């Protein structure tokens, strides 16, 4: 996986002694390395409190064992234990995931703890002069021997299979946010948003802390479908679904349980052979057929929109058009059974109740904040067009007192809560000179994506016509993406006000469980994706039933 540039310690280990004058003037000492020598037989426990150390030189001593407390030195990148009499290593050494160099030459090691395989950032592992088994020595002699040995140790980590059955993460809590509206007819339904981590992206280069067998799709897919089914959501939005897996796995599994679905792969699929196309990922939406009827389905290709609306903008052509992300949307009609179940009273009248569910996966690269923002504007613009056209064509039967078709937007936006993307969605617009545009010239082309119509820019601000609210607000979920290098919120469920409310959400995975089990990133043998799913129960406010003597009669509860 990507590593920060590593500078090994200077072997000369030069030092300076602070003068009394410097000390009197308030100069602070700073030392990040420590060398202990002189045939030392044991180490003081106070050593483990020096957590600021980045390098520890303990070679040429008479140490026979290393205490497990060494793992408290979590900032160490360099550890030299060569030329001692060490016979065994503590398993806790595997928790020192910042290590880049570990020197164990000329000791008395016969075995290595499998936990050393967790040192995925290690670049040098020196083992010369130890009576190790031949299979370990053979791995060390191979090209890229350190990496091969670490992979072997991690894949054979003792007890991993047993821990899967005994140390499952505790259930995520169900957080109630408000009670249903008892004063009017409503329909309740649940929505899941989940990036399942496509097989081709689940590599040891990206996720070096995860055993290869736990990255394998045949292993991960069982836990993924188990999580999806355990939520029993009425609507499921998935990102990073491989084309072949959509048709051979997800659709098969979910159809058996009463779902129908719609899927589109990323735009690159159109230029590929049939065999290559199978491995292109995309976005999928599933819905329970007992509660919804499919009216329309749509695919939004951002590179096609960029080409058609570039208006001479080089940034649009060179940065946005070259990315093949997509979004999908389905227009669903609520079945009368869902309305009856939720309102407690038969649905009267002939009007249809529609809802639009949209799902998208925006570009990943943090350096392309402008592209993510433009892609989001494109998607909202197309979603608005879909809703407007559906409203016009069915206006005699779909528009109640709320005035428009409600929207549920699920997405891996690859954008943090303080980004221009989330500002645009949650506040209704964004300035054309927003920092996320990186001072690139998008202005003329951006007006085409204003959801208030072409040239709908107001005072240098691009706006959209929705009132959107996030189901997960106020830190309810500290992170939706959890890897070693990045932990943050990038997945969202938005819904349109005033037609929709959030009643409850599925809370975060227990942080203490992650810490206690030294889980530095996901996926993990117990967590099948690098994303955590979002799951919310929503309430749709329905039009009042026909008036009797001028009084609205709400459904019975």
From Swiss-Prot:
The active site is at residue 412. Its cofactor is Mg(2+). GO terms for biological process: miRNA-mediated gene silencing by mRNA destabilization; nuclear-transcribed mRNA catabolic process, no-go decay; nuclear-transcribed mRNA poly(A) tail shortening; positive regulation of cell population proliferation; positive regulation of cytoplasmic mRNA processing body assembly; regulation of translation. It is found in: Cytoplasm; Nucleus. LRR repeats lie at residues 52-73, 75-96, 98-120, 121-143. It catalyses: Exonucleolytic cleavage of poly(A) to 5'-AMP. It holds the Pfam family Exo_endo_phos. Signal peptide: none annotated. It is an enzyme of class 3 (hydrolase). Keywords: Activator, Cytoplasm, Exonuclease, Hydrolase, Leucine-rich repeat, Magnesium, Metal-binding, Nuclease, Nucleus, Repeat, RNA-binding, RNA-mediated gene silencing, Transcription, Transcription regulation, Translation regulation. SUPFAM superfamilies: DNase I-like, L domain-like. GO terms for cellular component: CCR4-NOT complex; cytosol; nucleus. The keyword Glycoprotein does not apply. Binds 2 magnesium ions, but the ions interact each with only 1 or 2 residues. Mg(2+) 1 binds at residue 240. Mg(2+) 2 binds at residue 412. Transmembrane segments: none annotated. The keyword Transcription applies. Belongs to the CCR4/nocturin family. Poly(A) nuclease with 3'-5' RNase activity. Catalytic component of the CCR4-NOT complex which is one of the major cellular mRNA deadenylases and is linked to various cellular processes including bulk mRNA degradation, miRNA-mediated repression, translational repression during translational initiation and general transcription regulation. Additional complex functions may be a consequence of its influence on mRNA expression. Involved in mRNA decay mediated by the major-protein-coding determinant of instability (mCRD) of the FOS gene in the cytoplasm. Component of the CCR4-NOT complex; distinct complexes seem to exist that differ in the participation of probably mutually exclusive catalytic subunits; the complex contains two deadenylase subunits, CNOT6 or CNOT6L, and CNOT7 or CNOT8. Interacts with CNOT7 and CNOT8. Interacts with UNR. Interacts with ZFP36L1 (via N-terminus). Interacts with ZNF335. This is CCR4-NOT transcription complex subunit 6. The lineage of its organism: Eukaryota, Metazoa, Chordata, Craniata, Vertebrata.
